[in-house]
Amino acid sequence: MTQAAYDVIVSFSDTLAQHADFAAIKCCYEEAKIGDWLARLLTYLRAQPSAWVHDGLMVFDTSYELSLYITTPTEARALNLDYRGKDYATNILSYPADLPAEVADELPLVPLGELVICHAVVDEQAAEQGKSLAAHITHLIIHGMLHLLGFDHELGQAEQDEMERIEIAVLADLGVANPYELS
């Protein structure tokens, strides 16, 4: 069996790229680091026979590509309104690739989908919640990856509990405190 590979592509909105603090913002989204997070998440899921995955969507020894797009509140709000009917800038949106298995089998890297992150909202939430920006970004990206893999906490309490359990375990492996515990 060949070693699975995880390719992460991070892009930034043109408006955000012109921000005075762009260099600091860009450092928050290192492709190699996020690829490691994906590898650790998939390793964890592989070892969890109880973890459910939407319609057997993912074979965890496959090589994957993950795209992240970091944007502004204006664009995040428009996307949230267009695709979810919610008129506010949200922290993260997940757009799964949902390729048919016969197509995915032909590709060297299976696209998981795209995570759209509004950095300003994430930064504001981290400050409000008394969390480090790095810890909050890590949590949200792990959360978004789970959505791309077919997990959905909006289906009910059992699904929410399962997602949170996985997030807490993977974040602990990454040295990040439980984001659901009040500080």
Question: Which residues does each PLM region occupy?
Answer:
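An acidic/histidine-cluster motif and surrounding catalytic segment
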Residues: 1-138, 149-183
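Short active-site segment of divalent metal-dependent hydrolases/proteases
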Residues: 142, 146-147
